[in-house]
Design a protein with these regions (language model features):
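Low-complexity, Pro/Thr/Ser/Gly/Ala-rich linker/spacer regions in secreted
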Residues: 23-27, 298-310, 334, 359-362
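Bacterial N-terminal signal peptides
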Residues: 9-23
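Non-catalytic cap/lid and distal C-terminal segments of serine-dependent acyl enzymes
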Residues: 26-305
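Conserved beta-strand positions that form and line the central face of beta-propeller blades
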Residues: 42, 310, 337
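N-terminal secretory signal peptides that target proteins for export/translocation
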Residues: 1-8
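Alpha-helical segments with a strong preference for the paired helices of cellulosomal dockerin domains
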Residues: 311-333, 341-361
Length: 362
């Protein structure tokens, strides 16, 4: 009987979505947020076919050093209200920059709507990934003094943490670091709610319909596990700096530990930090990670500066890199797989020789 009841519960939850519209999901323009250093902007998105809003925070050096270019930190918000955290987050990172523990960065706060999961919806009505990657990032690069290249860190919390994983793994050419904070959903079946979840079955079913079209195959296709399985060689080869972090009281701990083990099984370098006594809250988690957490941002930006052909990480492309490449010739999962095609080949050697003598590209 329990099995039948579970099936019935799922059926009723899914069919409920037939009576729920897209109203809460399709909000391309938010109200402005007022906070020191924060700007509210809109742009025309080709993917969305309409105006889309975003917020951006600029460091004081953006005005005082008008010739300077800056790395970009992209923060992907969690589900629900995507703008309420902007004042706290901008102040938090501003303080760290003022203290000199991380370099000045531009912070981009995209509008991910309440429940987009930062994913292109199955029916095409909410092409969230394309809006962010294909439209918003080029717009920001064209209108703000960003360094470009891989001088970007992709970070997010909850829904945004899951999105940071999927988008960051998929586009290793755009991001040198990705940070999955309190990330979810990471379960293999979205309709299997984690213990303690505060998302009702009806809302969960509504999200499943509107984002993944009630299509288990599409959910799996867009799952970070699927993406990193396809992209492991590129993530490893490009030395993308990957971290997971969440609180010990977060209901998403088991699925994040499972994802940690999955990354380990693929040989993907990463870290997992579980902060004692912290629940599902970005404003509690980030301070709880302590001073040492700033090493993640600095490592990612240092990696962005390193030419991909600097295989040994010495800071310059030299004979040591040639030696390592030749030793790994034909191997998979090697940092010497510069073009991330899955193996160390002659094309990697050609790229290295073209870059011989090159140092940091910033």
């Amino acid at each position: 009987m329990r099995g039948f009841a579970a099936i019935l519960e799922r059926f009723l939850a899914v069919t409920t979505t037939l009576y729920v519209g897209m109203g809460a999901f399709a909000q391309w323009v938010t109200a402005p947020v007022t906070a020191p250093g924060v700007q509210y902007q809109t742009f025309q998105s080709a993917a969305a076919g309409q105006t889309v809003s975003f917020h951006v925070w600029l460091p004081s050096e953006y005005t005082s050093q008008p010739a300077r270019v800056f790395p970009l930190l992209i923060w992907l918000h969690g589900s629900g209200d995507g703008t309420s955290g902007i004042p706290w987050l901008s102040a938090y990172f501003s303080t760290a920059m003022a203290q000199g523990v991380i370099p000045p960065m531009i912070i981009l706060f995209p509008n991910g709507m309440p429940y987009s999961m930062w994913c292109d919806s199955r029916d095409g009505r909410v092409p969230m990934e394309r809006v962010v990657i294909d439209d918003l990032l080029p717009f920001v690069d064209a209108n703000y003094r960003t360094i470009g290249g891989r001088h970007r860190i992709l970070e997010g919390f909850s829904m945004g943490g899951q999105g940071a994983g999927r988008l960051g793994f998929r586009r290793t050419d755009l991001f040198a670091g990705l940070s999955m904070l309190g990330a979810g959903p990471l379960q293999d079946d979205f309709l299997e709610a984690p213990l303690g979840s505060d998302i009702s079955p009806v809302k969960r079913a509504m999200i499943y319909q509107n984002v993944w079209g009630n299509d288990a195959a599409y959910y799996t296709l867009q799952h970070p596990k699927t993406v990193i399985t396809q992209q492991a060689a590129a993530v490893i080869g490009r030395r993308t700096v990957v971290r997971q972090a969440l609180g010990s009281l977060d209901t998403l701990v088991p699925m994040n530990q499972d994802f940690d083990a999955f990354l380990t099984s693929l040989g993907v370098p990463h870290t997992l930090t579980v902060a004692p006594g912290i629940g599902h809250s970005a404003s509690d988690l980030l301070p709880a990670l302590g001073f040492g957490q700033w090493a993640f941002y600095n490592a990612a930006l240092a990696e962005a500066c390193r030419p991909l052909t600097d295989v040994d990480g010495s800071g310059v492309v030299d004979a040591g890199d040639v030696s390592l490449l030749l030793l790994d010739f034909g191997m998979t999962g090697s940092p010497a797989d510069v073009d991330a095609d899955g193996a160390v080949t002659g094309s990697d050697l050609a790229m290295l020789l073209l870059d011989f003598g090159t140092a940091c590209d910033a």
